[in-house]
């Protein structure tokens, strides 16, 4: 999936996450996480984000994640909404989701 434009998904409310994405000129993933629960769940948050990006074959992006203690399922949903917005596709290929 190609990221064509910057996009935002989520809120800064307690129990939610706000994620910003922007395309990069390289194939790197620049991931910056700011979380109120980073010491306890930072590795799990990072793993979830990288898993979703790998699933949709996303490279060459900058991600800024402001986590306020969100659940894994919400993090995944916010990421999928963000990817759809940033790539300009109207819907994700749900049949490919497992």
From Swiss-Prot:
Primary location class: cytoplasm
An example Gene Ontology CC term for this record: cytoplasm
Keywords, alphabetical: Cytoplasm, Phosphoprotein
Keyword Repeat on entry: no
InterPro entries per record: CitD, Mal_deCO2ase/Cit_lyase_ACP
Superkingdom assignment: Bacteria
Subcellular localization, as worded in the UniProt entry: Cytoplasm
PTM annotation (O-(phosphoribosyl dephospho-coenzyme A)serine): residues: 14
Annotated function: Covalent carrier of the coenzyme of citrate lyase.
Similarity annotation: Belongs to the CitD family.
Record note on quaternary structure: Oligomer with a subunit composition of (alpha,beta,gamma)6.
Protein's UniProt name: Citrate lyase acyl carrier protein
């Amino acid at each position: 999936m190609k990221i064509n434009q910057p996009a935002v998904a989520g809120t800064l409310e307690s129990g939610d996450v706000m994620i910003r994405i922007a395309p990069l000129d390289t194939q790197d993933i620049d991931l910056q996480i700011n979380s109120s629960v980073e010491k306890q769940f930072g590795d799990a948050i990072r793993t979830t984000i990288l898993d979703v990006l790998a699933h949709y074959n996303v490279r060459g992006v900058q991600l800024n994640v402001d986590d306020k203690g969100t659940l894994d399922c919400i993090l995944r949903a916010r990421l999928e909404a963000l990817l759809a917005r940033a790539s300009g596709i109207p819907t994700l290929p749900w049949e490919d989701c497992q």
